[in-house]
UniProtKB/Swiss-Prot annotation:
Record note on modification: Ubiquitinated by UPL5. Ubiquitination leads to its subsequent degradation, thus controlling the timing of leaf senescence.
PANTHER family, per database record: WRKY TRANSCRIPTION FACTOR 30-RELATED-RELATED (PTHR32096), WRKY TRANSCRIPTION FACTOR 53-RELATED (PTHR32096:SF94)
Protein name, entry field: Probable WRKY transcription factor 53
InterPro entries: WRKY_dom (IPR003657), WRKY_dom_sf (IPR036576), WRKY_plant (IPR044810)
Known partners and oligomeric status: Interacts with ESR/ESP and UPL5. Binds to WRKY30.
One Pfam family cited in the UniProt record for this chain: WRKY
GO cellular component, one term: chloroplast
Induction: By salicylic acid (SA). Strong accumulation during leaf senescence. Down-regulated by jasmonate. Triggered by P.syringae.
């Protein structure tokens, strides 16, 4: 019962203090409104007005001090509240909203808090200017890419980098809109590479891609740079060496042969054969372009200036086979 009575008494006391403070504040407000202008001849002495206002301010502050102490502050260490005089700023234009003054504890005004104490907006503006200058200093180049009919007309060919589309807008005088891309790792790896894609008005299969800045992210290390345009791209394929066909070689060999027939009329036995087989490794001439072995039929003295020596001991009908 005693606890309930104590609680009821504290509530009544708190309510009474709040009412007293509210009344004092209303009186002060009324006096400030009724205060005549300094130019009025019927104004009361300035000292009396100042003393009355000071008393009302002290009553308001004291009433709210006791109210705060009653709001469950009894268990915490005693806090000494220093009353701060309230400065009343007259409103020049009653129709406009006055600027909120600084609070008692020195916290910033509401508009300062909205923009981060006046520094966040300036920092954001400085960052924007810095990034704009940084983008203008990046290298810039353009390429034209033609889309093959098999791939359709959805966009330019992939340039092996990962891009993210962040905007598109219509260009004055152009039939097709312009698309804007930036590196996927802009936020994570601070890569400022961007590109713009514009479809040609004259040929819908041609896209003009404008790059600005090179990739500084991990893609630049693991991937190759963008392909050049078809006009600038050089054919780096290895062309096979042009070789002469075996039939042409044999025809050239037959037309350039020089046959020595010295000693054909000698009385030697034309049917005496040497120990070496007459057709030893003859197949190397027809299909293989490697080392040509010598045989009793003919010896190739020089591959580019062939001279054939006929063995006089070999039958004459085999000599004629060289020419046909």
């Amino acid at each position: 019962m005693e606890g309930r009575d104590m609680l009821s008494w504290e509530q009544k006391t708190l309510l009474s203090e709040l009412i007293n403070g509210f009344d004092a504040a209303k009186k002060l407000q009324a006096r400030l409104r009724e205060a005549p202008s300094p130019s009025s001849s019927f104004s009361s002495p300035a000292t009396a007005v100042a003393e009355t206002n000071e008393i009302l301010v002290k009553q308001i502050v004291s009433s709210y001090e006791r109210s705060l102490l009653l709001l469950n502050w009894s268990s915490s260490p005693s806090v000494q509240l220093i009353p701060t005089p309230v400065t009343v700023v007259p409103v020049a234009n009653p129709g406009s909203v006055p600027e909120s003054p600084a609070s008692i504890n020195g916290s910033p005004r509401s508009e300062e808090f909205a923009d981060g104490g006046g520094s966040s907006e300036s920092h954001h503006r400085q960052d924007y200017i810095f990034n704009s200058k940084k983008r203008k200093m990046l290298p810039k180049w353009s390429e034209k890419v033609r889309i093959s009919p098999e791939r359709g007309l959805e966009g330019p060919q992939d340039d092996v980098f990962s891009w993210r589309k962040y905007g598109q807008k219509d260009i004055l005088g152009a039939k097709f809109p312009r698309s804007y891309y930036r590196c996927t790792h802009r936020s994570t790896q601070n890569c400022w590479a961007t590109k713009q894609v514009q479809r040609s008005d004259g040929d819908a299969t041609v896209f003009e891609v404008t790059y600005r800045g090179t990739h500084t992210c991990s893609q630049a290390i693991t991937r190759t740079p963008p392909l050049a345009s078809p006009e600038k791209r050089q054919d780096t394929r290895v062309k096979p060496a042009i070789t002469q066909k075996p039939k042409d070689i044999l025809e050239s060999l037959k037309s350039n042969l020089t046959v020595r027939t010295d000693g054909l009329d000698d009385g030697k036995d034309v049917f005496s054969f040497p120990d070496t087989p007459p057709f030893y490794n003859y197949g190397t001439i027809n299909g293989e372009f490697g080392h040509v072995e010598s045989s009793p039929i003919f010896d190739v003295v020089d591959w580019f200036n062939p001279t054939v020596e006929i063995d006089t001991t070999f039958p004459a009908f085999l000599h004629e086979s060289i020419y046909y």
